[in-house]
A protein has these predicted regions:
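Long, compositionally biased
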Residues: 199-238
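Short, extreme N-terminal leader segments that mark the start of a protein/domain
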Residues: 1-35
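C-terminal alpha-helical interaction appendages
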Residues: 111-126, 160-169, 194, 201-217
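A glycine-rich, hydrophobic loop/mini-helix early in the fold
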Residues: 36-112
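Short, flexible, solvent-exposed loop/turn segments with mixed acidic/basic and small polar residues
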Residues: 10-15, 67-73, 118-127, 162-163
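Hydrophobic/aromatic-rich, well-ordered segments within soluble, folded domains that form packed cores
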Residues: 166-196
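Intrinsically disordered, low-complexity terminal tails and inter-domain linkers enriched
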Residues: 38, 117-164
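Short, surface-exposed beta-edge/turn micro-motifs
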Residues: 18-20, 75-78, 169-171
Length: 238
């Protein structure tokens, strides 16, 4: 189940065309729990399973530049990040990207510090949004795009009831491979007036973005097809 979830949501990371992917992982209940009344595993069980999967994934594939981290667990789901350390390091090696992320409160001294900052950002957002009575990350259920992408789609209006709803940390889009110019424009335009909408909202180069989205769709489709016919995660990593 976990491996299929990784392929479905992080195929482009495995293939090396995307620095990171953010997604929800929902472990199945064990067989001995099949007759109980609970709908899903408790957070402690989810945290334990997610941590085991992330640890094993990282142990196996970190030498090939890919790792997995658990960012947070709530309501029976784990928010997980599969990333390429070298690509994240390259991102923060770009002066404009580093300045943007640093201004947003990220530690840009290295990939691990960057992931740690992301964990703090996402946890803080979730806590504030939950306190405001809004939807939590546990309600993101779009398997075609990652969690941060889903938050940018127009079909997902803000459900917060506060006069000043907590702002989603849209700067995370840069870590997921979205162009910095589009992330900046998305923030400046309050998520409106885009020229094209797909994995992210494109403001600067819609045709280039569409080509990129198509390449991502093809990568994901091919990876899933290979996985279903017996390919291992190791074989899918570029």
């Amino acid at each position: 189940q976990y491996c299929q979830c990784v392929v479905r949501n992080a195929a482009c990371v495995l293939a090396g065309i995307k620095p990171a992917a953010l997604f929800n992982f929902i472990p199945r209940r064990p067989q001995e729990c099949a007759t109980c009344s609970c709908e899903r595993l408790c957070d402690a069980q989810v945290r334990r399973q997610a941590a085991q999967h992330a640890l094993e994934f990282t142990r196996r594939y970190s030498q090939r530049g890919v790792r997995c981290d658990v960012l947070m667990v709530e309501r029976g789901r784990a928010l997980m990040l599969v990333s390429r350390s070298q690509e994240l390091a390259s991102l923060v090696g770009q002066a404009d990207v580093a300045a943007f992320l640093q201004q947003a409160g990220f530690d840009v001294t290295g990939p691990r510090q960057l992931v740690r900052s992301l964990r703090i950002k996402m946890t803080g957002f979730e806590r504030r949004r939950e306190a405001a009575g809004g939807a939590t990350f546990a309600r993101i259920e779009n398997t075609q795009v990652d969690a941060a992408s889903a938050s940018m789609l127009p079909s997902r209006p803000c459900m917060c009831i506060d006069d000043e709803p907590p702002a989603f940390p849209h700067e995370v889009g840069v870590l997921l491979g979205y162009p910095l110019a589009d992330v900046l424009a998305f923030i400046a335009h309050d998520g409106k007036d885009e020229l094209a909408c797909g994995v992210w909202k494109a403001y600067i180069d819609p045709e280039g973005a569409r080509a990129c989205w198509q390449a991502m769709r093809e990568c994901r489709s091919q990876a899933l097809a290979r996985y279903r016919t017996g390919a291992t995660l190791s074989e899918l990593i570029a």
